[in-house]
């Protein structure tokens, strides 16, 4: 959203498809009546509020930061989690399911407790 503020392009954010279903619908609703060329500061502010209200782990998944439970993980383990997190063909619910499955298979007990 910050990058969008520095440009004159106003539109539904490109990450909207990566959001959980409820937040996806909320952001689409925010932008539904927007007309190209109009001021979009209200839409940007409301969208930012939706993002700010996301739990940390969801925000990390949507915007690409690795969650803290992976801080001590090997490079290979981090790569496996990144492959799921950055997979644009999976929606949020499928990513969550795949990440949970992977976590059960490869994380240590300590990491799994933090997961």
Curated annotation (Swiss-Prot):
Organism superkingdom: Eukaryota
Miscellaneous information on this protein: Antibodies against this antigen can recognize a human retinal pigment epithelium antigen explaining in part the retinal damage caused in onchocerciasis.
Protein name per Swiss-Prot or TrEMBL: OV39 antigen
Species of origin: Onchocerca volvulus
């Amino acid at each position: 959203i910050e990058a969008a503020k520095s440009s004159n392009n106003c539109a539904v954010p490109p990450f909207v498809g990566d959001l959980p279903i409820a937040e996806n619908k909320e952001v689409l609703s925010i932008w539904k009546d927007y007309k190209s060329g109009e001021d979009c500061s209200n839409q940007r502010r409301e969208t930012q509020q939706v993002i700010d209200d996301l739990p940390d782990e969801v925000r990390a998944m949507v915007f690409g930061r690795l969650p803290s439970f992976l801080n001590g993980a090997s490079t290979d383990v981090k790569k496996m989690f990144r492959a799921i997190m950055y997979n644009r063909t999976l929606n949020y619910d499928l990513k969550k399911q795949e990440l949970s499955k992977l976590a059960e298979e490869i994380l240590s007990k300590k990491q799994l407790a933090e997961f």
